[in-house]
Amino acid sequence: MAARLCCQLDPARDVLCLRPVSAESCGRPVSGSLGDLSSPSPSAVPAVHGAHLSLRGLPVCAFSSAGPCALRFTSARRMETTVNAHQILPKVLHKRTLGLSAMSTTDLEAYFKDCLFKDWEELGEEIRLKVFVLGGCRHKLVCAPAPCNFFTSA
């Protein structure tokens, strides 16, 4: 199960700030650095941290100080074109879910910037706010028979 999140770029810190889209979305944002997409160790992920938010579908690593293990940076509005244009990303994230080596952090950063930030710039949107899908890491394993089924529409 996936959770709907708001994602806003903080240019001062070069991070994407995530917050849940829910009745309790006034809580503090969860930040995940674009430069650090590696999975934190299980000991670095407190089981109760962030539990007060009462959000179903969020993996425990979403509340880790190291940030979530794997973010599916694909907006629901652009999911079809993004996935179809770049078939490699679903496969990469599926491999990350299984704990396999897939793609370098630099390549992932380039994908995010090319496919997402370019959309914001081309559309002329001043406020970089989108709804994204979070999930699919080793803390909440999502099994999929084929990479094309790895993404869950919001």
Swiss-Prot record:
InterPro entries, sorted: Transactivation_prot_X (IPR000236)
Q: What keywords appear on the UniProt entry?
A: Activation of host NF-kappa-B by virus, Activator, Apoptosis, Host cytoplasm, Host G2/M cell cycle arrest by virus, Host mitochondrion, Host nucleus, Host-virus interaction, Modulation of host cell cycle by virus, Transcription, Transcription regulation
Give compartment(s).
Answer: Host cytoplasm; Host nucleus; Host mitochondrion
Q: What's one Pfam family the UniProt record gives for this protein?
A: X
The Gene Ontology biological process annotation of the record reads: DNA-templated transcription; symbiont-mediated activation of host NF-kappaB cascade; symbiont-mediated arrest of host cell cycle during G2/M transition; viral genome replication
Ranges for the region named Mitochondrial targeting sequence are: 68-117
Cellular component (GO) terms are: host cell mitochondrion; host cell nucleus
Post-translation: what modifications? A fraction may be phosphorylated in insect cells and HepG2 cells, a human hepatoblastoma cell line. Phosphorylated in vitro by host protein kinase C or mitogen-activated protein kinase. N-acetylated in insect cells.
The main place the protein resides is host cell
Q: Quick check: keyword ATP-binding in the entry?
A: no
Q: Which sequence ranges form a coiled-coil region, renumbered to this chain?
A: none
Entry similarity comment: Belongs to the orthohepadnavirus protein X family.
Q: How does it assemble?
A: May form homodimer. May interact with host CEBPA, CFLAR, CREB1, DDB1, E4F1, HBXIP, HSPD1/HSP60, NFKBIA, POLR2E and SMAD4. Interacts with host SMC5-SMC6 complex and induces its degradation. Interacts with host TRPC4AP; leading to prevent ubiquitination of TRPC4AP. Interacts with host PLSCR1; this interaction promotes ubiquitination and degradation of HBx and impairs HBx-mediated cell proliferation.
What job does this protein perform? Multifunctional protein that plays a role in silencing host antiviral defenses and promoting viral transcription. Does not seem to be essential for HBV infection. May be directly involved in development of cirrhosis and liver cancer (hepatocellular carcinoma). Most of cytosolic activities involve modulation of cytosolic calcium. The effect on apoptosis is controversial depending on the cell types in which the studies have been conducted. May induce apoptosis by localizing in mitochondria and causing loss of mitochondrial membrane potential.
> What is the recorded name of this protein?
Protein X
Species: Hepatitis B virus genotype E (isolate Chimpanzee/Ch195/1999)
| Gene that this sequence comes from | X
